[in-house]
Structures are given as structure tokens and as C-alpha cells.
């Protein structure tokens, strides 16, 4: 068995967070999971002796430093932070209120950054640690109707990569994990949908929305297998800066990169024309 580590996983009540917690506990690690209610905390701690629950809303950024300090004092050093808390927003950009964008960024980006800032001092002092940010293939590719969500995941991908460069010499690893479509509740009850109002977009979005809802719960990706992949990542001595999960993510991101390379080549002369 790999050396026992203590993981702090946000959003541990369901989806990837719960699957990773179960896999890590089975592998002999300790897991602190943040959840949104006292009942969810009880359910999480029932997973096993190594499961430690805490109630936290990641948008309450002022509460995060105190929580991390309390955990370090009572549980011990936190070896791995997994920023998993998040949700998806679906809506045409023109129809979606700015408050929906602010909420999306508060949960998916600001909360994750606050968690990173809270664990970094101890990791930096110990010259050891691993931060894993669960992003999405939507942090590399885009599709109509999830502009706010993709924007939040593009942001977290960039933040993860830049932070990794800042802390690499300090013994701290940062990995952005980008899953494809998995059998989680992302497209189900956890997704926030802005009501439709502009008929011009019906032909574009309605089929996409219908297909997404029809596929929910039947996606190819298996959360339990994703958890094993993330566990291997956490236990790796030299983890990557980016990790895609799922054959769909591989295919779609490779296609995006090919199209990006083609655009760069087609417009290379214009790009170079701006040099003095």
C-alpha cells in the first residue's frame, strides 16, 4: 500500500468527491470531506473510521482559513487538497443574468482559490503537498449553452497551471483534472438552468439540452474508475500538470488542439506582422 496520506476533498457528498473519498479510504488513506449539511456530514463519516466530515459552503471564503487551521490542529497535516466542489450552469449567454455568472465563478473558481490559499502555507513550510483541481473537458473545449460553466473551468485550468509554476520549486504539485462525461449528477438535479426566452436560439440549444438530459445518468464515464485514476495520480511521485479523464475528453480535446494549430498556421503571417 502507498504511504498513508490525508486528503481534504470539497464537495464530498456525491459525484467525483464521494467516489474518490471511498477509493482513498479503501486504500488506507484518511479523508476529510466537506459537505453542505449536518446530515450529509453524518452520512460521510459513516463511510469508515478514516472519514472525517466538515460542513462548509466554499463561497463562505472567510470561513475557509479557520476550517483549515482547525483541521491541521486536530487531524494533522493535509497532504492533498482536492477542489471538487462545483456545479454546472446551462443557459444561452444573452439570456443568462450576470448574477448567474457571479455565482458560477464564486463556487467554481473563487472558492477553489480560497481553499488553495488556505492550505499553501503549511504545504510550503513542509515542502510537500499536492493540489488537485477538478476542472472539466469544458476547460479546454466549449459548446453552446454552457458559456458560464466553460468560462469558470477555463479560469481554473489557467490558475492551476500558473500556480503549479509558482510552487514547483517548493515541492508542491498542482494538477488540473479534466473529466469528460461521467455518470454523476452534473447534468441532473445539480445543474442550474436559466429559462429560455429568445426564440432565435431554439434551433441551436433545444436539441443540445434535450440530448444532455436524456444522456444524464447513462454517460460512458464511470465515477469509480475515475476515482481509481485520481488515486493513482495522488500516489504518483511526478504527477502531471493536466490529466484528462475519459475517451470522449481525449477525442474532443485532441480535435480542439488540431483546429487551434490549423488556425495558428493559417493566420501566422498576420500574427508575425505586428512585430516591430
Report the location of each language-model feature:
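Active-site helix of classical SDR
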Residues: 116, 152
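The beta1-alpha1 cofactor-binding region of Rossmann-like NAD(H)/NADP(H)-dependent oxidoreductases
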Residues: 56-66, 98
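Substrate-binding pocket helix/loop in short-chain dehydrogenase/reductase
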Residues: 92-93, 97-102
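SDR active-site lid
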Residues: 169-240
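Residue(s) in the substrate-gating loop at a strand-loop-helix junction
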Residues: 136
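A glycine-rich helix->loop->beta "capping" turn
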Residues: 70-83, 89
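Conserved glycine-rich cofactor-binding loop
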Residues: 13-14
Amino acid at each position: 500500500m502507498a504511504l498513508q496520506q490525508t486528503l481534504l476533498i470539497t464537495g464530498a457528498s456525491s459525484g467525483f468527491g464521494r467516489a474518490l473519498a471511498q477509493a482513498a479510504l479503501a486504500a488506507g488513506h484518511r479523508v476529510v470531506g466537506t459537505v453542505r449539511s449536518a446530515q450529509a456530514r453524518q452520512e460521510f463519516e459513516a463511510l469508515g473510521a478514516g472519514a472525517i466530515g466538515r460542513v462548509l459552503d466554499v463561497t463562505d471564503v472567510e470561513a475557509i482559513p479557520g476550517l483549515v487551521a482547525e483541521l491541521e490542529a486536530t487531524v494533522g497535516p493535509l497532504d492533498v487538497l482536492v477542489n471538487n466542489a462545483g456545479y454546472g450552469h446551462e443557459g444561452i449567454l444573452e439570456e443568462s443574468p450576470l448574477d448567474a455568472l457571479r455565482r458560477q465563478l464564486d463556487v467554481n473558481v473563487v472558492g477553489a482559490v480560497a481553499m488553495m490559499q488556505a492550505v499553501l502555507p503549511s504545504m510550503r513550510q513542509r515542502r510537500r503537498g499536492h493540489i488537485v483541481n477538478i476542472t472539466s473537458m469544458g476547460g479546454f473545449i466549449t459548446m453552446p449553452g454552457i458559456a458560464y460553466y466553460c468560462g469558470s473551468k477555463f479560469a481554473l485550468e489557467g490558475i492551476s497551471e500558473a500556480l503549479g509554476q509558482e510552487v514547483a520549486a517548493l515541492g508542491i504539485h498542482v494538477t488540473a483534472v479534466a473529466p469528460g462525461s461521467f455518470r454523476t449528477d452534473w447534468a441532473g438535479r445539480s445543474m442550474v438552468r436559466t429559462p429560455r426566452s429568445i426564440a432565435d436560439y431554439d434551433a441551436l440549444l433545444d436539441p443540445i439540452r434535450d440530448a444532455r438530459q436524456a444522456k444524464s445518468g447513462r454517460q460512458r464515464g464511470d465515477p469509480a474508475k475515475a476515482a481509481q485514476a485520481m488515486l493513482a495520480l495522488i500516489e504518483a511521485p511526478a504527477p502531471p500538470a493536466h490529466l484528462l479523464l475519459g475517451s470522449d475528453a481525449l477525442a474532443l480535446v485532441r480535435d480542439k488542439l488540431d483546429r487551434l494549430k490549423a488556425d495558428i498556421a493559417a493566420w501566422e503571417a498576420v500574427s508575425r506582422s505586428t512585430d516591430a
